[in-house]
């Protein structure tokens, strides 16, 4: 007889199973997949630790949370700093001062504000009818054409002019030269992958 039957061996299920077991409860975890870890499952591909279901970067500003996950695995100091390649030109993401300098040669936050105001002036009184118009109203045509249009159309599989404007409510603009994607104090990826965390959480649990 079990106290808890947990459906899903992902992070949430594994944490609950670990905490319940620690408190003396008898737990069983089941999952329809043939592996534990859920969407943070990692696999070794020719010596490379691959996040099978897409990249997951752990980040938090809560020290209690950070200390908790670090008891199950050692984390590296990976900082996510995405770069977009548009026809051979490189741009930092999210949009920040480095992005704007590469795009326009602007060097100060005020220059960026002035440039964006100039780029979006013609859309001031326009009610966007589609995603393209919404993006241009928010950030202007230069950024839209180079860093939003292609990615968005590939993601949705249709023209940006056929997508509703509400998909983009706002676009993050950072007026600093910090390329860190996240603002959290703690971040990284567990050395050896997330499997290490899940395996350590479930080592005393029936799966």
Identify the role of each PLM range:
Residues 26, 49, 74, 206-207:
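Conserved beta-strand segments of alpha/beta enzyme cores
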Residues 11-12, 34-36, 98, 153-154:
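Short, solvent-exposed loop/turn segments at secondary-structure junctions
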Residues 87-91, 97-207:
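Active-site/ligand-binding neighborhood in enzyme catalytic cores
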Residues 2-29:
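N-terminal Rossmann-like FAD-binding beta1-loop-alpha1 element of flavoenzymes
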Residues 46-122:
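Dinucleotide-binding Rossmann-like beta1-alpha1 core, especially the glycine-rich loop
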Residues 20-22, 68-72, 198-206:
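Alpha-helix C-terminal capping segments
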Residues 21-46:
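Glycine-rich FAD pyrophosphate-binding loop
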């Amino acid at each position: 007889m079990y106290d808890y039957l947990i459906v899903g061996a992902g992070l949430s299920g594994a944490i609950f199973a670990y905490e319940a077991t620690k408190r003396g409860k008898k737990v069983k975890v089941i999952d329809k997949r043939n592996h534990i870890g859920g969407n943070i499952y990692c696999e070794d591909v020719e010596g490379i630790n691959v996040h099978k279901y897409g990249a997951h970067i752990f980040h938090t500003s809560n020290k209690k949370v950070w200390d908790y996950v670090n008891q199950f695995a050692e984390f590296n100091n990976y900082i996510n700093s995405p770069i977009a390649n548009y026809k051979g030109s490189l741009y930092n993401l999210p949009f920040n001062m480095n992005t704007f300098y590469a795009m326009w040669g602007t060097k100060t936050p005020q220059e960026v504000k002035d440039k964006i105001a100039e780029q979006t002036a013609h859309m001031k009184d326009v009610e966007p009818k589609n995603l393209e118009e919404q993006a241009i109203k928010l950030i202007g045509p230069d950024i839209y054409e180079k860093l939003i249009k292609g990615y968005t159309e590939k993601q949705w599989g249709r023209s940006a002019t056929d997508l509703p404007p509400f998909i983009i409510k706002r676009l993050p603009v950072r007026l600093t030269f910090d390329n860190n994607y996240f603002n959290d104090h703690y971040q990284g990826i567990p050395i050896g992958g997330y499997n290490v965390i899940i395996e350590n959480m479930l080592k005393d649990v029936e799966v």
